[in-house]
Amino acid sequence: MKKNKNYVDLKDQPVPEGQHLLEVDDLKMYFHTEDGVVRAVDGVSYTLDRGETLGVVGESGSGKSVTAMTIMGLISMPPGKIEGGDVRYRGRSILEMTEEEMQHIRGNDIAMIFQDPMTSLNPVYKIGRQVGEGLRLHRGYSKQEALKRATELLDLVGIPEPEKRVNEYPHQFSGGMRQRVMIAMALACDPDILIADEPTTALDVTIQAQIIELMQEMQEKNGNAIIMITHDLGVVADMADKIMVMYAGRPVEFGTAEEIFYESRHPYTWGLIRSIPEQAIEEKKPLTPIHGNPPSLMNLPEGCVFSPRCPYATDKCRKQRPERVVTESGHYSACHYSGDPEFLTNAPETSRTRKDSKKGGEA
């Protein structure tokens, strides 16, 4: 089995000492339109290592998917333009790679599961051909070899009768099964990093749980790093090692899953937590929505971008953009008052009581 003669596999190269598998450093992606500049991603930073899961959470328009598409090199330029920052994979800048180099990266080193499998799968090609396409491109598999491996992958992700289903078309699969096909496609070349963009949004709760469990099983087996993009904090509650909360193109809070759920410091994160049905049940209170709408990314408010919707906003919030307040552990939040103990008493009940209850359980 031969690889393409021009094939470059960065996975064969070690991560440089002192660096991470993936490093996103102050990334800024703007779109220049006739109506103005859209600051879609404005200062995103995080690191990721093999075996880790990062949850990226926020409402529609927060910049979650644009960040992922920038990493994959799938943003059209123009109108998109990198205004600052860098993305490094195994020590190499992705933003400086040529399109030919990125074609070797996509699907092989970094793979992506898109939000809607029905529009991501080609309706006129059989599933086996689509799952095996990456293997033929990146691994030099023959048509027969790719089909055999595609059958194995469908079996791996829990699709019954894979020998039969590999010769069927996307419309013959249910929504949950199509999403499993997308996961099989993404895992075909054993990527270092798997980006899952709202992979469970259109699925019912039972199928959501199955898809998340499947991704966790694949990660345990292969050691992939996962970036899980979602608008629902509840989806990443038991899956993520660390979580970045985004709002209006900016990261407003970042920390371990434990810190975000039980020591959160930003009012927007509190709003997302209170929007989780299980949290409302725990507090014995009705669901509390975040009132208002996200701002236009072409006309962001002065000061804190969340201030028009924040129930705790002051004149300082409305006039000054907050700096990130960072704790010793690296947990940060972009709020003027996130270091104020009295202000933090406004956090959801779970955030304020988790530590005490854990101590009580350990005693």
Model-predicted segments: where are they?
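ABC ATPase NBD Q-loop/coupling interface
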Residues: 32, 86-104, 142, 213, ...
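Short catalytic/signature loops enriched in Gly
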Residues: 10, 14-20, 160-164, 256-358
